[in-house]
């Protein structure tokens, strides 16, 4: 072709008014328009909202909620990079499988140990329905802001959900009874010369579920380090707990790009190749 020929480019901006359908919409467009280059399309909706509003997790300020329960306004008296900042006093319930060596689905008797307010309770009933009812009673009594589990993502939470579905007994894991659970599939990836397995996520609505066994950040720095990273990266706390430091750094770059009207290309990641020693 003539090197001096005019190259025509078509730019389209598409807005998705229902955030929960953002990823579905992107997948549909990518399937029907494979030759298009997409930008700002693979950023999670929650992070996009925080980039757009310049809010960040645990931002201290005044928030206005309308009659429908929607956020209608806010005045933030905080900075994401503040060294000293107030943190909310969170109610924490710990939850673990008594027999960690045996996956819950293979146990004849459901045995859970939950702890809150300095007291531990053993839920051990041969009738799984009774165990779920007792768990719901403790959830209502404690009303935790955070459920801290061991192996909750991989086995405990999925098992409780399947048990709840089978017995038709609603679980009160979410504060919002109309909300579902946010789950992702387990994955394996190659990095720094080795294959790493990562459990899928099991996140809640209205309260946080943090799996101490599926969070490098919680293992090394506990709540203080998690909160600091979530504020800096603008990644919601539950998701930040399960991500790597590299993902957090990428989010900080994306936030800067979004604020400065720089388009972020989708599908940027390339598989890592072997490197010489």
Describe the role of every protein-language-model region.
Residues 1-277:
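The two-metal-ion catalytic cores of nucleic-acid processing enzymes
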């Amino acid at each position: 072709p003539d090197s001096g020929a005019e190259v025509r480019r078509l730019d389209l901006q598409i807005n998705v008014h229902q955030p929960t359908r953002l990823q579905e919409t992107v997948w549909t467009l990518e399937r029907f328009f494979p030759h298009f280059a997409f930008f700002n399309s693979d950023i999670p909706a929650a992070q996009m909202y925080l980039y757009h509003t310049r809010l960040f997790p645990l931002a201290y300020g005044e928030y206005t909620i309308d009659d429908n329960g929607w956020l209608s306004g806010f005045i933030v008296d905080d900075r994401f990079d503040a060294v000293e900042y107030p943190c909310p006093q969170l109610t924490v319930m710990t939850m673990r499988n008594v027999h960690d060596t045996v996956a819950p689905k293979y146990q004849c008797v459901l045995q859970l140990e939950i702890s809150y307010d300095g007291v531990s309770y053993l839920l051990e009933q041969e009738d799984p329905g009774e165990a779920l009812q007792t768990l719901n009673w403790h959830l209502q009594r404690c009303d935790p802001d955070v459920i801290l589990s061991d192996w909750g993502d991989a086995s405990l939470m999925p098992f409780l959900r399947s048990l709840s579905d089978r017995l038709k007994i609603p679980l009160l894991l979410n504060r919002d009874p109309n909300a579902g659970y946010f789950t992702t599939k387990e994955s394996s990836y190659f990095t720094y010369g080795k294959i790493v397995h990562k459990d899928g996520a099991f996140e809640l609505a209205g309260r946080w579920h943090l799996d101490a066994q599926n969070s490098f950040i919680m293992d090394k720095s506990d709540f203080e380090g998690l909160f600091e990273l979530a504020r800096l990266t603008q990644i919601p706390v539950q998701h930040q707990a399960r991500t790597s430091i590299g993902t957090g750094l990428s989010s900080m770059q994306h936030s800067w790009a979004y604020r400065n009207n720089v388009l972020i290309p989708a599908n940027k990641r390339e598989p890592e190749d072997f490197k010489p020693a």
